[in-house]
């Protein structure tokens, strides 16, 4: 009987561990979903700022015809 009780205790312990691990996996999944959402948002912002930077750069650069010659000419 001791062996059977030991086995039942081990099974109960394993069931407890599995339940705990299921809970941890679910929590980690929620954190991962949140991080993916934040990452997507940051990537969108980086693309937006990169485009904005390109537009600012191209609008501030004058063509060679528009440039005034240096003072030594």
UniProtKB/Swiss-Prot annotation:
Top-level taxon in the UniProt lineage: Bacteria
InterPro entries per the UniProt record, alphabetical: SlyX (IPR007236)
Coiled coil: none
Pfam families: SlyX
Family: Belongs to the SlyX family.
Name used for this protein in its record: Protein SlyX homolog
Lineage of the species this protein comes from: Bacteria, Pseudomonadati, Pseudomonadota, Gammaproteobacteria, Pasteurellales
């Amino acid at each position: 009987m001791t062996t059977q009780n030991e086995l039942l205790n081990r099974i109960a312990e394993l069931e407890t561990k599995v339940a705990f691990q299921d809970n941890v996996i679910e929590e980690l999944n929620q954190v991962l979903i949140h991080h993916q959402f934040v990452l997507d948002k940051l990537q969108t912002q980086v693309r937006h700022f990169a485009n904005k930077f390109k537009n600012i750069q191209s609008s501030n650069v004058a063509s060679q015809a528009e440039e005034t010659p240096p003072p030594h000419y």
